Amino acid sequence: LESNNVITRKRVVSFLRTLFHESEIQQFERDNAHLEGFDFIDEVLGYFDFTYKISGRDLERIPSYGRLVIVANHPIGTLDGLALLNLIRRVRPDVKVVANEFLSRFKAYEPVLLPIDNMSGNSRRQNLKNIRSHLEQEGAVIIFPAGEVSRMGPTGVRDGKWSKGFLRFAKETRSSILPIHIDGRNSMFFYALSIVAKPLSTLWLIHEMFKQENNTIEFRIGDKVEWEAFVNTDISAKEVAQMFRRHIYRLGKGKTPVFKTRLSIAQPENIQHIRKELQQCELLGETGDNKKIYLFNYQPNTAIMREIGRLRELSFRAVGEGTQSRRDIDAYDRNYMHLVLWDEDELEIAGAYRFCDTNMMLSIQGIDGIYTSSLF
């Protein structure tokens, strides 16, 4: 009898190792032991040939700077989290993700993780402090508020109730929240198993990950929600968290968002394109700290003008103003000349000022051609 029990245990262990793809995972770790962080993530996504789709306009909604809490639904599990990291780092190399227990076991992920250890109160306090610290250093943090993968329900595949923790981080650090909807699914067997035996279905997720091979998911990114939109409210944090959950799913369906959003500022222009265009401009002089002064005559569809417009919007929003457009460019730019201060050390536009020949402008367009006439 004891011999039969030993044989049975061995068979069960062998089955579980096969089910959890133990040998494949261990072999992958050995083959890529020299990689970590985003390099390791690239290899994981490549191993599964797991890809994602996103529109150019959605990609531009990712803020290129500033404190940012990114929240998303979690339809698949590990792979949708890695794909989201891969996406966000294209704009925000400083992005990190709040880790689940499975990812925390892999040292290769450490550079991009902000793990939470529930085993120790002191450790947990330190981990929460690390998340706040990363945001206070103007970083970006991905959080899956559901804390687990989506399940099948009466309205389809949906996250469970969202934890309010992400709101606390955003409020304490005055961070904007970027909502992202992920369109993806696990197998019907997984959802059926979730109904019958939820703990077992969680273990089954490893097998589900391998069934995602050659799959493609789609990201929909909404405009960011400024912290003022959710901090000054009489609604409880628990209710606000569920409102963000609804916001995400409305985003996925292209419906009107729950929260008032703010159009993200355009992404920076390609540095080499700006430099090439500046070389065609008249060089007026240089400053003592290695900055060059160029005269730029307006031309449509130029990297210089787009970058000036982006920097204007960035500067004015910082003091509570701005056009609330992706770039601050108006009709006066077409008829004005532009002084551009180029920082050769930092490879960026350090400043810009537009001006015109007033007498000439008055003779051609009258008083309406003068910008200051629109202010008084």
Report each predicted region and the residues it spans:
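Structural motif
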Residues: 69-71, 113-115, 142-144
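A conserved beta-strand-loop-helix scaffold within acyl/acetyltransferase catalytic domains
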Residues: 290-376
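Conserved N-terminal entry element of GNAT/NAT acetyltransferase domains
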Residues: 262-299
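Non-catalytic C-terminal accessory region of glycerolipid acyltransferases
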Residues: 1, 94, 125-273
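Membrane-anchoring hydrophobic helices of lipid-metabolizing enzymes
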Residues: 1-74, 81-83, 90-92, 110-111, ...
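Short acidic (Asp/Glu) patches
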Residues: 55, 65, 69-71, 77-84, ...
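Short, flexible loop segments at the rims of nucleotide/cofactor-binding pockets, characterized by
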Residues: 30, 45-50, 117-122, 155-156
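Conserved nucleotide-cofactor-binding alpha/beta core module
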Residues: 89, 95-124, 128-135
